[in-house]
Amino acid sequence: MKNNVVGWFEIPVKKMERAISFYEKVFDLKLDRHKMGPLEMAWFPWLEDKSGSPGTLVYHPEYYEPSVDGVLIYLTAHSGDLSNELLKVEAVGGKILQPKTEISAEYGYMALILDSEGNRIALHSRQ
């Protein structure tokens, strides 16, 4: 297979400003915001020639609803140790659902959080 199966992911939000603030502060990054009529998106940084899939926060009053159920997205902790990102979650309106837990020596660690919009999101790191 030459390409990843996942084209991109969308994380539903109710309040774009609040969601952007949450993700920028937890992951120490800048989202790229776009508005197309009633559809609003804020894209995570990504490079086309690197591994992983691009993703965006998305708001549309008719088509998207944040949820703790359903698909689970794993976001890479760019600090290298998801403990660093977990330290910021509650301070910016999120909740830790499952603390840092070892998956295995080979695959590293994961944690589950509830973001500022009510979405269940997983974090992953090798350390």
Regions found by a protein language model. Give the residues of each.
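N-terminal beta-strand motif that seeds the catalytic metal site of vicinal oxygen chelate
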Residues: 1-20, 70-73, 125-127
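Core segments of cupin and vicinal oxygen chelate
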Residues: 10-53
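Vicinal oxygen chelate
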Residues: 15-16, 73-117
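Active-site beta-strand termini and strand-to-loop segments that position acidic
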Residues: 44-49, 113-116, 126
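Domain-length accessory/inserted modules outside core catalytic folds
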Residues: 50, 62-68, 75-79
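Short beta->alpha transition motifs characteristic of CBS
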Residues: 104-107, 123-127
